[in-house]
C-alpha cells in the first residue's frame, strides 16, 4: 500500500477503530497471561465528552494499550453511571416541553420513560469515547442500573444494615429546594454573593440587659435554640447558663459555652440554629439537644412551617425563606433591636443543577457508618497496599478520612436504586433484597417500600468488583488459582480484582476513590486497586478555570475534527505532569498534529527508499556507526519509556518518544543515511541501513502506539504485509547489549558539531545557501579522524567545507566543539560591523526588558496582589528575555 502524500486523520480513525472493535481486539482473551485491569470512572449516561474526560480516558488508554503490548491480559472495564439527578432532570425537561409533569405518571410509568430515553439517547458519550480511541472492553459494557450491578448494590445495602453499619438517622443534609432532594457536597457550588451581615440584640430573659449576635441569614432566628459564647471570653462568663428571650417568637433559649464562638469575630456571641446550620448542629449536640428535638422551620420547598413549640407567628407561615428574611429584619427593626447592617460578600451554596440556594435541612435519611469503614482505608494507604500518585495527596486523604462524617446515602428521587427497606403500619423497618424476603421478616404484615433511592456514589463505589462478577462469582476460586498456572479455571472476579490502577481527577478523591477503597476492603477483603493516580484540572491557556459562562471551554471533539485524535491524545499526555493542572493551548495540539505529520513523512521517505517492515524482533547486525548509534538510541528510548510509564510520569514518557522520533530519528538519522541510500552508494551498506531503518521504524510505531494508536496502526500495515495488528504486537525489548558506546560517542559528536555550526550561522544571519570554509584549531587525533570519516555528512548538513592550513585574517565566527575550535571566515559573506551593531542593540533591548521584569518579580506587592496568571506570564517573559540576551551574547562572542 502506497502511503498517501498528505496525512488525513479523518480518513483512517473510524476505519481502524471499527476494525479493532469488530475483531475483538479490546477483549481480555489471554487466560494464561498476567492480568492487568483498569476500570473507567463511569461517566454520566446523560453526558457528552468534555476535555476532562478526554484527559482521564487518554491516560487510562495509554496504560491499557501498553499493557496489551507487554503481553498482559488487559481488561479496561467500561460503562456509564445512571446519574440519578441529572437523568431525572433530562426526562422531566422533555415532559415539560410536552406540558407534562413527572407527577402526572406513576413511579413505574416515569421510570419506564427514563429507560426509553436511556436506550434512545444514552449512548452519546460512549460513541464519543470511541472517537478518542479508547480501547475498552465494549463487549462487556456495564451500567450502574443493569441487573447484575443492581443485585450487587442491594446486597451491599442489606449486608451493611445487618452489620449495623447502615442506619436511619435525623441529621442535617444539603437540601436542594428546587429538586426537593438531599445532594452531595460535590453537587454544591459555592458562589460569592453580595449580601448583608445583620447585627441584632437579644434581650436577657431577666431584663438585666441584652446580648448582640450577627447573622447573614436572619430568617433562621425563628428556629434559634441557643446563643453560644466562648468559655474563655471574660465578657460573657457570668452570662453562661442564663437565657435570652427571642424577638418575634418570645422563645426562651439558653446561653451556652462552646469553643465554636470566636471572641475576635463580631460581638463574640453566636446565635445557634441546630436545624439549619452544619456548625450549629454540632454545637447543639454538644449543648445536649437531641436531633429529634432540634427545631425545623422550613419545608421541602424552603417555605416557613411551624416549629414543634408552635411559637412562630401565623403571618410568617407559608412564606418563602427570602420573604421571611425581609419580614424578620423589619420586625426586629420595629422592636428597636436592629443594631447595624454591614455589606458583605457571602459564600453562598447553590445546587449545581437547580441553581437554587442550598438549605441545611434537618431530615430523616439513611446513613453509612463511614468512620468504621474508613479505618481500614486509612491503613491501606499508610501500609503501602495502595500507592497514591502524587504522594502529596495522601495528607489530604488522611485528613478527610480522620474527620469523616456519617455518609448520607438516600435521595428523594424516582430514578435510581430504590432503597430495599419496607415499613409496616407502625413504622417498623424491614431491610431485605426483595419484598418477599422483607415480608417474611415482617411475618406477613402489609408493607410499604421506602420511596427514596440511593446516592449514585453509593452504587459507583462498588464499580471495581461489581462490574466483574461480584457477588455471583464471589468465592468460586481461590486467588492463587490462576497464579498456579490454572488461569483458565479462575473466575473473572478472581483474575481482575484487585484492579491495577485507578486514574481519577483529584476532585473526586473523597466522593468516589476513598469510598471504593472502603467498600472494596469491606466486601472483598482486599484493596480495590494497587495504585491511585490523581490528575489535575484542564484549564484554559491563561491558567483560568474553564467555564461555559466565561466562554473558554474547549470541545475535545472539535479538536479531534480539526487535528485528529492522535494529536489531542499526545497533547494531553505530554502536558500531564504529576501534581499540576494542564493549561491547554490549541497551539500545542496543532504542534503535535505536526509531529504526526513528521512521522507520516518519515514513513513515506522510508517506503520511497525501499525501507519496509522488519523481519526480526532483534536489531539487525550493523557495521556503520550511524546504524549502531540509532540502534543504541532506540534501546535507550525503550529503557527510558519503560521507567517513565512504570512511574506514571506521562509527560516524561511522551517527551521521551517525541524527542527520539523528531530529533534522533527524523532530524538526524534519516538525514545522515540519505547519502548511504543514494544511487551508486555501496550496496552492502545500503542493505544494512534499510534493515536497520525498518527495524527502528517498527520499534517507533510500537512505542508510540499507546499514545497515537491510529497513525501507528495505519503505518504499521502500510510499511509491510503483516499478519497481525500493531495493537497486539510485542513491546520492544530493552537489551543493553545492543548499546555501542563508541558509535554513540561518534554520532553524538557529529550532532554537536553540526548543531553548533548551524547555531552560529543562524545567530549571525549567514545566508542559508552560503557555503563556508572551516579551519580546525587544536583538534585531537581522534577528532581529526572523525572529521575525515564524517566529512560528507558535515559538508551536507552544516554547509561547511573543511579546509587545511591557517584561516585567513579578517572577521570570522569561532565555533567550539569539545577541545577543537573551528574558524569560519565571514568576510564578504555578511557585513560584520552591521552584524555586531545589530547584536549589541538586540542584547541591550533584551537585557532592559529582562531587568524590568526582574524588578517587577522582585516586588512583593506585585507577586502577592496580581492575578496568578499575570505573575506566571511575567516569569515566563523574564525567562524568555534572559535566554534571548544569552543567545545574542553568544553570537556576538563568536565574532571575536
Swiss-Prot record:
It is found in: Cytoplasm. Gene3D superfamilies: HUPs, Isoleucyl-tRNA Synthetase, Domain 1, Valyl-tRNA synthetase, C-terminal domain, Valyl/Leucyl/Isoleucyl-tRNA synthetase, editing domain. Residues 831-857 form a coiled coil. A motif ('HIGH' region) lies at residues 43-53. Its EC number is 6.1.1.9. Belongs to the class-I aminoacyl-tRNA synthetase family. ValS type 1 subfamily. ValRS has two distinct active sites: one for aminoacylation and one for editing. The misactivated threonine is translocated from the active site to the editing site. The C-terminal coiled-coil domain is crucial for aminoacylation activity. GO terms for cellular component: cytosol. ATP binds at residue 548. The keyword Oxidoreductase does not apply. The keyword S-adenosyl-L-methionine does not apply. InterPro entries: aa-tRNA-synth_I_CS, aa-tRNA-synth_Ia, Anticodon_Ia_Val, M/V/L/I-tRNA-synth_anticd-bd, Rossmann-like_a/b/a_fold, tRNA-bd_arm, tRNAsynth_Ia_anticodon-bd, Val-tRNA_synth_C_sf. It is an enzyme of class 6 (ligase). CDD domains: Anticodon_Ia_Val, ValRS_core. It comes from the Bacteria. Keywords: Aminoacyl-tRNA synthetase, ATP-binding, Coiled coil, Cytoplasm, Ligase, Nucleotide-binding, Protein biosynthesis. Monomer. Catalyzes the attachment of valine to tRNA(Val). As ValRS can inadvertently accommodate and process structurally similar amino acids such as threonine, to avoid such errors, it has a 'posttransfer' editing activity that hydrolyzes mischarged Thr-tRNA(Val) in a tRNA-dependent manner. This is Valine--tRNA ligase. One of its GO terms (molecular function) is aminoacyl-tRNA deacylase activity.
Amino acid at each position: 500500500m502506497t502511503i498517501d502524500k498528505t496525512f488525513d486523520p479523518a480518513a483512517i480513525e473510524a476505519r481502524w477503530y471499527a476494525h479493532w472493535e469488530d475483531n475483538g481486539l479490546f477483549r481480555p482473551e489471554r487466560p494464561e497471561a498476567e492480568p492487568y485491569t483498569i476500570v473507567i470512572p463511569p461517566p454520566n449516561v446523560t453526558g457528552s465528552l468534555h476535555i476532562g474526560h478526554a484527559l482521564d480516558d487518554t491516560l487510562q488508554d495509554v496504560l491499557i494499550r501498553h499493557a496489551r503490548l507487554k503481553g498482559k491480559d488487559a481488561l479496561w472495564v467500561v460503562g456509564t453511571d445512571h446519574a440519578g439527578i441529572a437523568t431525572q432532570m433530562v426526562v422531566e425537561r422533555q415532559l415539560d416541553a410536552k406540558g407534562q409533569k413527572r407527577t402526572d405518571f406513576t413511579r413505574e410509568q416515569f421510570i419506564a420513560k427514563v429507560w426509553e430515553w436511556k436506550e434512545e439517547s444514552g449512548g452519546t458519550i460512549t460513541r464519543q469515547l470511541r472517537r478518542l480511541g479508547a480501547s475498552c472492553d465494549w463487549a462487556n459494557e456495564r451500567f450502574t442500573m443493569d441487573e447484575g450491578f443492581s443485585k450487587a448494590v442491594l446486597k451491599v445495602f442489606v449486608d451493611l444494615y445487618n452489620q449495623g453499619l447502615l442506619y436511619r438517622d435525623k441529621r442535617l443534609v444539603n437540601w436542594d429546594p428546587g429538586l426537593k432532594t438531599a445532594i452531595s457536597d460535590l453537587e454544591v457550588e459555592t458562589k460569592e454573593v453580595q449580601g448583608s451581615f445583620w447585627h441584632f440584640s437579644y434581650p436577657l430573659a431577666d431584663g438585666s440587659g441584652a446580648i448582640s449576635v450577627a447573622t447573614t441569614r436572619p430568617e433562621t432566628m425563628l428556629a434559634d435554640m441557643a446563643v453560644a459564647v466562648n468559655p474563655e471570653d471574660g465578657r460573657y462568663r457570668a452570662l453562661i447558663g442564663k437565657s435570652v428571650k427571642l424577638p418575634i417568637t418570645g422563645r426562651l433559649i439558653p446561653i451556652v459555652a462552646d469553643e465554636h464562638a470566636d471572641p475576635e469575630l463580631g460581638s463574640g456571641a453566636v446565635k445557634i440554629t441546630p436545624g439549619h446550620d452544619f456548625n450549629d448542629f454540632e454545637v447543639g449536640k454538644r449543648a445536649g439537644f437531641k436531633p429529634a428535638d432540634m427545631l425545623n422551620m422550613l419545608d421541602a420547598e424552603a417555605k416557613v412551617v411551624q416549629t414543634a413549640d408552635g411559637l412562630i407567628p401565623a403571618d410568617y407561615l407559608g412564606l418563602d425563606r427570602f420573604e421571611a428574611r425581609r419580614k424578620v429584619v423589619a420586625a426586629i427593626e420595629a422592636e428597636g433591636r436592629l443594631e447595624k447592617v454591614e455589606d458583605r460578600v457571602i459564600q453562598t451554596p447553590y445546587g449545581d443543577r437547580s441553581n437554587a440556594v442550598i438549605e441545611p435541612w434537618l431530615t430523616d435519611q439513611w446513613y453509612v457508618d463511614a468512620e468504621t469503614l474508613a479505618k481500614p482505608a486509612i491503613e491501606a494507604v499508610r501500609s503501602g497496599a495502595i500507592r497514591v500518585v502524587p504522594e502529596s495527596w495522601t495528607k489530604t486523604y488522611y485528613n478527610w478520612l480522620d474527620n469523616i462524617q456519617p455518609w448520607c446515602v438516600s435521595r428523594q428521587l424516582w430514578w435510581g436504586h430504590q432503597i430495599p427497606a419496607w415499613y409496616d403500619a407502625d413504622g417498623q423497618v424491614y431491610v431485605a433484597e426483595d419484598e418477599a424476603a422483607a415480608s417474611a421478616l415482617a411475618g406477613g404484615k402489609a408493607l410499604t417500600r421506602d420511596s427514596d433511592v440511593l446516592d449514585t456514589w453509593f452504587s459507583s463505589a462498588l464499580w471495581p468488583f461489581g462490574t466483574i462478577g461480584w457477588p455471583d462469582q464471589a468465592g468460586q476460586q481461590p486467588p492463587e488459582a490462576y497464579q498456579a498456572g490454572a488461569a483458565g479455571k479462575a473466575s473473572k472476579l478472581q483474575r481482575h480484582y484487585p484492579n491495577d490502577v485507578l486514574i481519577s481527577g483529584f476532585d473526586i478523591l473523597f466522593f468516589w476513590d476513598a469510598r471504593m477503597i472502603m467498600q472494596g476492603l469491606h466486601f472483598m477483603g482486599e484493596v480495590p486497586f494497587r495504585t491511585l493516580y490523581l490528575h489535575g484540572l484542564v484549564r484554559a491557556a491563561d491558567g483560568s478555570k474553564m467555564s461555559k459562562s466565561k466562554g473558554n471551554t474547549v470541545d475535545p471533539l472539535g479538536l479531534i475534527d480539526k487535528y485528529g485524535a492522535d494529536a489531542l491524545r499526545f497533547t494531553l499526555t505530554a502536558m500531564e505532569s504529576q501534581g499540576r493542572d494542564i493549561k491547554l493551548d490549541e497551539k500545542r495540539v496543532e504542534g503535535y498534529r505536526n509531529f504526526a505529520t513528521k512521522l507520516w513523512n518519515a514513513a513515506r521517505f522510508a517506503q520511497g527508499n525501499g525501507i519496509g517492515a522488519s523481519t526480526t524482533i532483534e536489531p539487525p547486525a550493523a557495521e556503520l556507526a550511524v546504524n549502531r548509534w540509532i540502534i543504541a538510541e532506540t534501546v535507550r528510548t525503550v529503557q527510558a519509556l519503560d521507567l517513565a510509564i512504570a512511574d506514571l510520569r506521562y509527560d516524561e514518557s511522551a517527551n521521551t518518544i517525541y524527542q527520539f522520533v523528531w530529533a534522533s530519528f527524523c532530524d538526524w538519522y534519516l538525514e545522515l543515511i540519505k547519502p548511504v541510500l543514494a544511487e551508486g552508494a555501496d550496496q552492502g551498506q545500503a542493505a544494512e541501513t534499510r534493515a536497520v531503518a525498518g527495524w527502528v521504524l517498527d520499534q517507533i510505531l510500537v512505542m508510540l502506539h499507546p499514545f497515537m494508536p491510529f497513525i501507528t496502526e495505519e503505518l504499521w500495515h502500510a510499511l509491510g504485509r503483516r499478519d497481525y495488528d500493531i495493537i497486539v504486537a510485542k513491546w520492544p525489548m530493552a537489551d543493553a547489549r545492543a548499546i555501542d558506546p563508541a558509535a554513540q560517542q561518534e554520532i553524538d559528536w557529529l550532532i554537536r558539531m553540526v548543531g553548533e555550526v548551524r547555531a552560529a550561522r543562524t545567530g549571525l544571519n549567514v545566508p542559508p545557501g552560503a557555503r563556508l570554509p572551516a579551519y580546525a584549531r587544536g583538534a585531537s587525533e581522534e577528532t581529526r579522524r572523525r572529521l575525515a570519516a564524517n566529512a560528507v555528512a558535515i559538508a551536507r548538513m552544516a554547509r561547511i567545507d573543511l579546509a587545511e592550513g591557517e584561516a585567513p585574517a579578517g572577521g570570522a565566527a569561532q565555533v567550539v566543539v569539545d577541545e577543537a575550535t573551528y574558524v569560519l571566515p565571514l568576510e564578504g559573506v555578511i557585513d560584520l560591523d552591521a552584524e555586531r551593531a545589530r547584536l549589541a542593540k538586540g542584547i541591550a533591548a533584551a537585557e532592559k526588558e529582562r531587568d524590568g521584569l526582574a524588578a517587577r518579580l522582585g516586588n512583593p506587592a506585585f507577586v502577592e496582589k496580581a492575578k496568578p496568571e499575570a505573575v506566571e506570564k511575567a516569569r515566563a517573559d523574564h525567562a524568555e528575555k534572559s535566554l534571548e540576551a544569552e543567545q545574542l551574547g553568544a553570537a556576538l562572542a563568536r565574532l571575536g
